[in-house]
A protein has these predicted regions:
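Single conserved hydrophobic/aromatic residue that forms the stacking wall/gate
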Residues: 1-7, 11
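Active-site loops and adjacent core secondary-structure elements that bind or stabilize anionic groups
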Residues: 10, 116-122, 126, 132-140, ...
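Internal alpha/beta scaffold segment
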Residues: 12-44
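Gly/Ser/Thr-rich active-site loops/lids in small-molecule metabolic enzymes
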Residues: 24-31, 62-91, 143
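Generic secondary-structure signature for well-ordered alpha-helical cores
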Residues: 33-41, 71, 75, 89-101, ...
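Flexible, glycine/charged-enriched surface loops at secondary-structure junctions
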Residues: 39-50, 77-85, 98-113, 171
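Conserved phosphate/anionic-ligand binding catalytic regions in large, soluble enzymes, centered on
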Residues: 42-64, 120-134
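Catalytic or ion-coupling anion/metal-binding cores of large enzyme and transporter domains
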Residues: 77, 84-90, 103-105, 113-114, ...
Length: 172
């Protein structure tokens, strides 16, 4: 478990919520802000942080999507769905507007990047989880071939077409 997940278990899972259809995008933004402020005030996440959000699926799927979004996507990567990509940028700006910065001090650098992964869910309720990944996310990706050749990649490209839901059916 990351520090943010272990700490949130102690504080009654403030990184997970069941949203209702009437909550809409505003409900997503409100829960995001509630979580970021709680993490920042208590020092539960290393600020500035990479934020991963899982939306949809069952509770366990939602948590996995959020962790993958935080830990596996590289900074600057955008969701292939244009509306989700816009929401990622909007939440990043929103997180940086709360007046908290590095180590919980006053500032405008709470969020380095915000990544969202979406899963299928029932229309009666929508799971949402928020996860913080430390700024010092050290990672290297290499592929070892059968002939002994090693190739390194800058982008780990974890999300295949099979793993990622490419589009969301938006209701007008």
């Amino acid at each position: 478990l990351s520090r943010s997940s272990a700490a949130s278990d102690v504080y009654k899972r403030q990184d997970y919520r069941m949203l209702f259809p009437s909550d809409g995008i505003e409900g997503i933004k409100k829960f995001f802000l509630d979580t970021i402020v709680a993490f920042g005030k208590r020092g539960l996440a290393c600020q500035p942080a990479i934020i991963g959000i899982g939306i949809g699926g069952s509770k366990d799927t939602c948590m996995v999507l959020g962790k993958r979004a935080a830990c596996l996507r590289i900074v600057g990567d955008k969701n292939p769905d244009p509306k989700i990509s816009m929401l990622e940028e909007e939440l990043k700006d929103l997180g940086n507007s709360i007046g908290m910065g590095a180590m919980g001090f006053v500032g405008k650098s709470m969020v380095i990047d915000c990544n969202i992964e979406v899963g299928y869910c029932h229309t009666g309720g929508m799971q949402m989880s928020v996860h913080a990944f430390c700024l010092s996310s050290r990672r290297a990706v290499a592929r070892i071939h059968g002939d002994g050749k090693i190739t390194y990649r800058n982008n780990p490209d974890w999300f295949t077409d099979y793993q990622r839901r490419e589009t969301v059916e938006w209701q007008v």
